[in-house]
A protein has these predicted regions:
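Gram-negative bacterial Sec-dependent N-terminal signal peptides
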Residues: 1-20
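Outer-membrane beta-barrel biogenesis signature
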Residues: 19-37
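Extracellular/periplasm-exposed beta-strand and loop segments of Gram-negative cell-envelope proteins
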Residues: 43-69, 92-132, 157-196, 221-252, ...
Length: 315
């Protein structure tokens, strides 16, 4: 699938060049549009640990879940030519948001389907989340009523969490789930950060009927570079992982109404996912100064859903 999509995008310039050679090429420096919107972000990000000595099975997973974090989103697009557009957009959380984290371990190799240790941290905060996207679009069809094109771009996104307090159930001294308790309220447990960097390719289109306009896009990357930083404050240990060549999928749809010839109000929804893949981890012990590096023991995953309402203006 990766090579097929890449082939389609790479052959698009041939069609665009043919279109340009017909004499339709012209600069349109005045055709610039901007939009701003407000909305919410919900989703889940996951970190995993695998044991290569036990066939690479999963031995730990932390799920960081967030819901309805307020975001602000903006974009600017320049129709450089009738068949070529440049764009930049991004979004950011407006403030931190309450979230939830669950940490589970499967440490019994003889009963791999049953967790042995679990801690729950309902007092978790999504400290921040943000993203920027730079892209270029080539229009195969570009008419007042409809557009269809291919695009390529570069995108980065970041997430930061902090878990405090919570409860736990541990299996200690060879027993099973025999120790239960709670962490002091406000005590820092784990701090976690994720970062995703990726080039991508995709398709984009829109259709207008009278004052109504509908649009959508699909983006794909098989070249995601993910990294994370996991701080275990009580143990004074830091885990830093890197994963390469993960898959990314994004689907977005919008609907709008032109209140004036240049201004449109719109609603938009997007679903985004970065699939799990194994990577490498470096461990740093701040108590002793020791460090270690292991291959194929980490897993990083993220998915989210975003809804926004906004205003677009074309100059």
């Amino acid at each position: 699938m990766r090579m097929k999509l890449l082939g389609i995008v790479l052959t698009a310039p041939v069609a665009l060049s043919s279109f340009a050679s017909t004499g339709a090429i012209s600069f349109t420096p005045g055709n610039i549009s901007t939009d701003i919107s407000l909305g919410t972000l919900s989703g889940k990000t996951k970190e995993r640990v695998y044991n290569p000595d036990e066939g690479g099975r999963k031995v730990s997973q932390l799920d960081w879940k967030f819901s309805n974090a307020a975001i602000i989103k903006g974009a600017i697009n320049w129709d450089l030519m009738p068949w070529l557009s440049l764009g930049a957009n991004g979004w950011s959380t407006i403030d931190s948001r309450g979230s939830n984290m669950v940490d589970k371990d499967w440490l019994d190799p003889h009963n791999v389907g049953t967790w042995t240790d679990e801690s729950k941290h309902p007092n978790t905060r999504l400290n921040y989340a943000n993203e920027f996207d730079l892209n270029i679009k080539g229009w195969i069809l570009n008419e007042p009523e409809y557009q269809l094109g291919v695009m390529a771009g570069y995108q980065e996104s970041r997430y930061g969490f902090n878990a405090t307090g919570g409860t736990y159930i541990y299996s200690e001294n060879g027993s099973f789930r025999n120790e239960m308790g709670s962490f002091p309220d406000g005590e820092r447990g784990i701090g976690y950060k994720q970062r995703f960097k990726m080039p991508y390719i995709g398709f984009i289109g829109s259709y207008r009927y009278d004052s109504f306009e509908f649009g959508g896009s699909f983006k794909y990357s098989g070249w995601v570079e993910a990294s994370d930083n996991d701080e275990h404050y009580a143990r004074a240990i830091t885990f830093r992982s890197k994963v390469k060549n993960q898959n990314y999928y994004s689907i977005a749809a919008n609907a709008g109404y032109y209140v004036t010839p240049h201004a449109k109000v719109f609603v938009e929804g997007s679903w985004n996912r970065i699939t799990n893949k194994k990577g490498d981890t470096a461990v740093y012990d701040k108590n002793t100064g020791a460090s270690d590096y292991s291959k194929n023991i980490a897993g990083i995953e993220n998915y989210n859903f975003m809804t926004t309402v906004g205003l677009k203006y074309t100059f």
